[in-house]
Amino acid sequence: MNQFKLTLLVALLSSLAIGQQKSSHQSVIEYVNPFIGTSNYGATNPGAIAPRGMLSISPFNVAFDASGREIPLEKDSQWLSTPYVHENEFLTGFTHVNLSGVGCPDLGVIISMPTTGEIKTNHLDYGSAYENEKAEPGYYSVDLKKYGIKTEVTATQRAGMSRFYFPAGTSNVLLNLGLGLTNEQGAMLKFVSPTEVEGLRMVGSFCYNSEEKAYPVYFVAKVSKEPQRRGIWKKHQFYEGLEAQWMGYNGETRMKENFSRAVVGDSIGGYFSYNFKQPTVVELKVGISYVSIENARENLEKEIGEKNFTQVKMMTQRAWEKQLSAVEIESDDENKKKIFYSGLYHASIHPNIFHDFNGDYVKSNGEIGHTEGERYTVFSLWDTYRNYHQLFSLLYPKQQMQMVNSMLSIYDESGWLPKWELNSTETFTMVGDPAAIVLADTYLRGLTQFDAEKAFTAMKKSAETLEDNPLRPGIKEYLEKGYLSVDRGVSGPVSTTQEYNIADFAIGQMAEALGYAEEAKKYKKQSLSYRNLFDKEFNLLRPKHANGNWYSPFDPDKGANFEKNVGYIEGNAWQYAFMVPHDMRGLIQLMGGEKKFVKQLNEIFNNQKFDMANEPDIAYPYLFNYVKGEEWRTQKKVDELLQKYYKNKPDGLPGNDDTGVMSAWMMYGMLGFYPVAPAQPIYTFTSPKFDKVTLNLDTDFHPNGKIEILSNASEGGKYIQQIWVDGKVYKSYFITDRVLKNARQIRFELGENPKK
């Protein structure tokens, strides 16, 4: 039996073993569809990754449009900042470092590609159409039609493994360091043996920010079989001056066969070439590190070493099974279960670990640090402070604590809390001071095992530093006037005022929890300054000049669909009208009472002013719960939005997943509660979508260990008739974090008609 057939047999036996394992107990990972979000700008990818993995192997198919017509690689085109789009049909390799559900291009580098025949170095020449895709947590496979090559990939947290099923004849494994999603260039590659290369690729400039802080990702790559030929290619830039007369390689790609010294350049790559007499399997193992080549090699050896593909896949899938089993769903609706677990899967990708196997990592100041715990990165905090961290405080408190401690380490290293941090680089993307909100919210939910005094000091620094404040531009005017004007050059002055208010409220909450009464009073008063921007003529928040005059002409609709406008960031006046979650009762009074409040909310939903695909207004469906007798509108609207935007299909997200925030919104809607007010440990109810859900909580933080959520959802009713908590009638549509976590059972009676 040849090696090709033997490998196929091993893979088949492995699949049978996993299938037997699934039949003995219900597996959670079988309900994950990694293709959800790969269309409709969801920016996810179906590649292989471990929970919180630093490395992932994703198919790279963004060099051609859906019709196969050649186009330039437009990384920011229509916000498609992802290595994979479901509609595209032309694959140019498998990238080893990626982001999931973000709105700007970066990473997407260290791209491998199996080919046959003559070696070609241009991805548009060697790329291939593909078919028979399969994806599950920790695994992806595809057939390359051009070459008749089946490819399978799997990954650990810091290393990955690809398996290429080559036909007989000339076959190649390419490693392209020129292609990628990052806006940075530059790479190094060196053969250290006939079967091993090492090198680096520069990345950075996320959202075209912090370009001066571009940094390397190091790698080591090994093939399982020694090639007949190996080498490096380098494409040279084109010169038009006199020197071009003597350059025979001007603008050409130069092949360097058996070259064993380092090659440096912008468009370089390496190849392993074989001449197989029969079909043969070649495995490629890659380890990465942001610290050094030596650490990349150690990560590879420690996490994969001599393990075979099947062992690595099963190890990672066991890790996913453990991660996703925090929630157990009992329902006959298989489709809804797949939507839910796919969301929990996507939410478990970022933030991801940033430290190597030995604990080394790159600090925010560029020095090498060491951690005995876990160092996390990819903090998309403008997005995640609204619902994401509350979910992980509940389901995965140890992970949330490590995230908080990572934020405090960033403060120690850089002098500031993170805003939108990526691989120890502050990108300063979006607005506001969101880390303060996450720190306070985590502490108020009982996760207090971090240095709260340091956190409070860090929070106050960003709120009180008047000069050279990178987190709060315009703070001096904000403190003097109570708002940011359109005259001082701060982006989205209305939106940013609101964000500063929410952060100030969080600081006040933290101050109160720590016993600082005067500071609590000060910050809570400061958090209400958005009222200076409330215009009763429109019942909306409106931009103002520094002299106190309203900005005119004022068009409340301007700014939808990412259109730039004077007052708001990624939204318009309607989408920011209710974004004061800490003062909803006060806003009701400003708007003239409950009837006008509900009327204005209905205006948003009834006239297509609501944007499900972005963060500022995603809590709005739950705001009807603040008005007695109108709670049914929340239940109706959440149900409609779930059905409209969340599907078990590639376009099954409303838009960019924003590192799991949109998935978190869906999960809360299906579970029946939502954290409507960041930095307040409360939830508000809606109708659950499953008959029974068990939340398996960490007993180190939640002694009861389990919460059961029961309902008669399968009978078709979507309106809450009654709620019971531990057998007693519960008369409020709000529940504190403490009461929810101490409950053993929450039961909903649902009906077909609203209870008004």
Question: What is the role of each PLM region?
Answer:
Residues 503:
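ATP-dependent phospho-/nucleotidyl transfer catalytic cores
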Residues 21-437, 443-498, 509-532, 538-575, ...:
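Accessory carbohydrate-recognition regions in carbohydrate-active enzymes
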Residues 1-23:
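Bacterial Sec-dependent N-terminal signal peptides
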Residues 706-715:
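Short aromatic-glycine motifs in intrinsically disordered, low-complexity regions
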